[in-house]
Design a protein with these regions (language model features):
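Conserved small/polar residues in nucleotide/adenosyl-binding loops
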Residues: 252-259
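Extracytoplasmic substrate-binding proteins
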Residues: 135, 148, 152-247
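Glycine- and acidic-residue-enriched helix-capping/strand-helix junction motifs
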Residues: 114-115, 246-251
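A short, structured surface patch at a secondary-structure boundary
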Residues: 53-59, 64-151, 157-164
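Bacterial Sec-exported substrate-binding components of ABC uptake systems
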Residues: 2-100, 211-237
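Active-site catalytic microenvironments for nucleophilic, acid-base chemistry
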Residues: 105, 205, 256
């Protein structure tokens, strides 16, 4: 991949910004990288903007994904290990749970046709409403998807959590059906706003970068306003009840207690 390294930034009025300093960009045969998305907290992904409207998502310790614009094809000489995702995305299988709220925040639940959870398991009310209305349907949990339904519904992308790494045969089967698999690694971010900033990645997938940047800026502002919040020095026990009915207490280093 050819690249520019002058280092200037460009930003729209709503906060979406790119830089043409791509000196650290991966070298991918078949594409020319021109700029990359500016990130403030996230450390586990980068989004690169290429010639002719292509975008490259590079997930740390994960995979690389090429977003191919509507009406175009992947370059013939593209590196074989780059996963190709064709836009527009309209019939996603959402097997991961955390991205649902991010899709909802940029008004994009209509791109999700298939769900890895039943309506009563969703914490996002708009997702519950979509399932009750039939515009989003249950397609099996991440570990046991309904492959026939994925095919009959013309699924164009499966979004999975890292739990799919424990079910490699499931991922392989989905890919054998010519459905690209994107693995969300937002849980590996070291701080809450890093995980929230993954909304910018999904904004790039859906060509909604401005909407995603607006939402993130608002959330960052809320957190910034808490910087002077007085520490009471009080502690709290954080636990949940698992499917066996047992109380599970998380370590203080785990994401929820830290957040």
């Amino acid at each position: 991949a050819e690249s520019s390294t002058s280092g200037s930034d460009t930003a729209s009025a709503d906060g979406f910004a790119t830089t043409d300093d791509v000196s650290d960009a991966p070298d991918i045969t078949g594409i020319t990288i021109e700029s990359q998305m500016v990130l403030n907290y996230a450390e586990c992904f980068n989004v690169y903007y290429c010639t002719d409207g292509y975008k490259l998502i590079d997930v740390k310790d994960g995979a690389q994904y090429l977003l191919v614009p509507d009406g175009k094809e992947a370059p013939d000489d593209l590196d074989s290990d780059v996963i190709v995702i064709h836009q527009p995305l309209e019939r996603i299988y959402m097997a991961a749970t955390s991205p649902m709220a991010l899709f909802d925040a940029i008004d994009s639940l209509d791109t999700i046709r298939l769900s890895g959870e039943t309506a009563d398991n969703w914490y996002v009310q708009d997702a519950v409403d979509a399932m009750n209305a039939g515009t989003m349907i249950f397609a099996g949990k991440y570990s046991e998807p309904d492959y026939e339904l994925l095919v009959s519904e013309n699924c164009d992308l499966a979004i999975e959590s890292t739990m799919i790494l424990h079910s490699p045969k499931v991922q392989e089967m989905i890919e054998m059906l010519d459905i690209p698999v994107f693995i969300d690694r937002s849980s590996y971010e070291s701080q809450p706003l890093g995980r929230t900033e993954w909304i910018k990645l999904y904004g790039a997938m859906l060509d909604k970068e401005e909407e995603a940047a607006d939402f993130f800026a608002n959330q960052a502002s809320i957190v910034e306003n808490l910087k002077d919040f007085q520490n009471t020095e009080k502690t709290v026990a954080f636990f949940y009840i698992n499917t066996s009915g047992a109380a599970v207490c998380l370590l203080y280093t785990s994401p929820s207690p830290r957040d």
